[in-house]
Every structure is written in C-alpha cells, then in structure tokens.
Amino acid sequence: GFTSPAPRDYVGSKPLVAPEAIAIYNFTRLHNFRLILAYHTQGKEIYWQFQNYATQEAEQIGEIFAQVSGYALSEVPYNSSFAGYKDWFLQEYRRPGYTIEAGLGENPLPISQFNDIYNDNIGILVLGAVL
C-alpha cells in the first residue's frame, strides 16, 4: 500500500491531493486550534514529536494523555513520519499535535474493541478541549 491507493499506509502522490486532506487543511486554516488530535487505529500509542518541532509543552500534554488513556507516549518511527496531519501541524504552527493510535491489532480493528477504545480515549478528548 505504499505506492498506490490502499486501505492503509498510502500517503498519496503529493500533498493535498485527496479531498479529505484538502478538507482538513482548509478547516485547520480557518480555525486557531491550540492543539490537534489525529486519530489512527493500531497500537495504543500517542505520537507527539516530528523532527524536533514539538515544544516541551507538547511532551507534557502528551504525558497527561498517556496517563489518562493507558497508551504509551512514543516517538514516531522514522518510516512513518513526513506525511501526517500532526507532522504538518507541528511544522506549520509550532503547537502541540498528536497522532493517537487507538486500539490494538491489525487494521481493520474489530468492532468488539469499540468500547475499550472509547473508554481509553474519552479522557484525551475531554482534556484536549480544555488543556
């Protein structure tokens, strides 16, 4: 899935080609977000850094998110960087941004994980609105 459209891992032929990427880009430009959360599934991890653009505050907030969710606060694997919403937001705005890898297992995750994912992430969603 790295070189052609697929259910996962394909980042596109260039930035801002996919309609959903354009929509998120435009929506972000219209708002003055203090922080952003980008949700993916697979891993029970929180990625917070991108090429040293993240601030110390971003790590501190990430630690709070990790504590309330039980997810690990992690560095993004190098081969997974450079194409995500969080990466762009950190570079463009120098504000906290996070990719939340919800759930555990291989995509697509089973619907049976829904309640666990919800319970793990409700604290992140509430705190993300007020921190």
What kind of feature is each model-predicted range?
Residues 29-33, 70, 126-130:
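Sec-exported extracytoplasmic/periplasmic mature domains
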Residues 43-44, 71, 81-87, 104-107:
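Short Gly/Pro-enriched loop/turn and capping motifs at secondary-structure junctions
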Residues 1-55, 63, 99-109:
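Active-site/substrate-binding loop(s) of hydrolase catalytic cores
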Residues 77-97:
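Short glycine-rich, acidic/polar surface loops and turns
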Residues 19, 23-26, 56-64, 80, ...:
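Extracytoplasmic/secreted proteins, especially bacterial periplasmic and envelope-associated proteins
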